[in-house]
Amino acid sequence: TLTKKIQQKYQNFKLSVSLTTRSPRSNEVEGVDYHFVSRTYFEELVAKKKFYEYAKIFENYYGTLKKNVDETILKNDIIFDIDWQGTKQLSKFKNLNLIKIYLITINKEELKKRLIKRNQNTKEEVKKRFNSFDDDIKHWNDYDYIIINKNLDVCFKQIEKIISLNKKRISISSHIIQ
């Protein structure tokens, strides 16, 4: 929701569509939410060094193709909706001029509540996300900005301020975006 809101207000911001080996959820669209690929194909791309970043998260791979990013940044600013592992890898590429924003829920219970309310994850996925919270939050200091994601409108206003201050490419990592 938040990335869509950013794109609606800022026409020059495009979402980097990641590749993943996981199955699509019922509401996801190929090429809009993710590019859904086989594990074999993903591993071939890794071997050929085609990714700016990739990570294995809960038994599935996610990654950002260099080609897609390089084509996008010629004309637009780009939003990466990725976790801390991806952000850490992308940070090595200075040409991307990242402004790193970490969105975090207030606490683990709120994360669990939002994941269940979103109704897009299995019980097992919710449990894994819940259990990884403490480890994930340890990486907050790798970011330029930390935003507590309590309210969508407040969160969006904070991101607007960051955009106006920086006018650069932005990486948004989060436990959950409403």
What are these regions, as identified by a protein language model?
Residues 11-13, 94-99, 141-143:
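Short glycine-/polar-rich loops that comprise or flank the Walker A/P-loop
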Residues 20-78, 84-85:
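ATP-dependent small-molecule kinase phosphotransfer cores
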Residues 27, 70-73, 92-96, 137-140:
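Conserved catalytic network of the ASCE P-loop NTPase/AAA+ motor domain
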Residues 78-83, 93-118, 148:
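Conserved phosphate-donor/acceptor-positioning beta-strand/loop module used by diverse small-molecule
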Residues 86-89, 155-156:
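Short, well-ordered alpha-helical microsegments
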Residues 107-112, 123, 153-156:
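An amphipathic alpha-helix signature
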Residues 117-121, 135-178:
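NTP-dependent small-molecule kinase module
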